[in-house]
Amino acid sequence: MDLKDFIENFAAEFDETPAEAFAPETEFKTLDEWNSLTALSIIAMVDDSYNKTITGANLRACTTIEDLFNFVASL
């Protein structure tokens, strides 16, 4: 699992946010496009791309994309 690829997969779940807005330190819940549907898309992306299951509570516990990456990598 690679952080760069994870960020690309994460960014692909957003339609209107430019790719350059996504970095390891991005606080994803502050993005204008972030909402409950996007959260579900991220949960599905983690399941589909990495064969790992996360919950909404797991997602809420993360602040940055790197936090989420580290959590998923630890599973």
Predicted features and spans:
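Phosphopantetheine-dependent thiolation modules in NRPS/PKS and related acyl-activating systems
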Residues: 1-34, 38-43, 48-75
